[in-house]
UniProtKB/Swiss-Prot annotation:
One of its GO terms (molecular function) is rRNA (guanine-N7-)-methyltransferase activity. Keywords: Cytoplasm, Methyltransferase, rRNA processing, S-adenosyl-L-methionine, Transferase. It comes from Synechococcus sp. (strain JA-2-3B'a(2-13)). Transmembrane segments: none annotated. GO terms for cellular component: cytosol. This is Ribosomal RNA small subunit methyltransferase G. HAMAP family: 16SrRNA_methyltr_G. Pfam families: GidB. Specifically methylates the N7 position of a guanine in 16S rRNA. Belongs to the methyltransferase superfamily. RNA methyltransferase RsmG family. InterPro entries: rRNA_ssu_MeTfrase_G, SAM-dependent_MTases_sf. Residues 237-246 have a biased composition (Pro residues).
Amino acid sequence: MKKADAPSSEPPELKALWESWLADLGWQPSEQQQQQLQQLYPLVMAGNRTQNLTRITDPIDFWEKHLWDSLRGLRLLGSWEAIQAQPWRGIDIGTGAGFPGIPAQIALPQTRFTLLDSTQRKIAFVQDILQRLSLTQARAVAQRAEIWGQDPQERGSYDIALARALASAEICAEYCLPLLKVGGRAILYRGHWTEAEAQTLEQALELLGGKLIHVEAFTTPRSRGVRHCLLLEKVAPTPPPYPRSPGTPKRQPLGQSNRP
């Protein structure tokens, strides 16, 4: 299958952004990684013509809000030098068009990512992208997170879990924690973050065997948008009832008075 080339008429500002990873993220991609990241924009835009993958179509916004944002969250796991060498199992829950999972797979080549989404058409698109970018260590799966988290082969088997633009933090925690090993970590990508949200999340984590380790606030490099990334750790086995049946986490988010 023919690989997509990077756009030949990129705006000058975008060309500068492609060279700014080290300053913005403390990360320097290899030539192959840079090429893979640059190929994502034309591939996603081509897919966007036939299905609703993203509303972000400006190339500079795409770099910041999909690529940079996806990679920025990984910094919570440790130094780039350390995490790039880890033979982890990772999962991106609710991957959509492949974010943050595809950029994460490019940046962490030793990790084997599962990109999970309940929509078959989106997973077919992601599978095509993985093939075009030769990301053979990753897989894309069409399944609900609630079902995947109760699968005996998947439950408790992942080192890291990512959830971005998916649902409220306590819902994301119910999707992520059952899939993690004890000691595994989840990164939840958020916009603004409030004390009320933190309290609700803490209540959910008590039920799920998790702990909120760190909340990191930052701004995006171009639009100066406010972002927060939450680092969770699984400190005890998740009780068998979680995740609850499909749809229940969203209908009845976990909280102090919400036990199975």
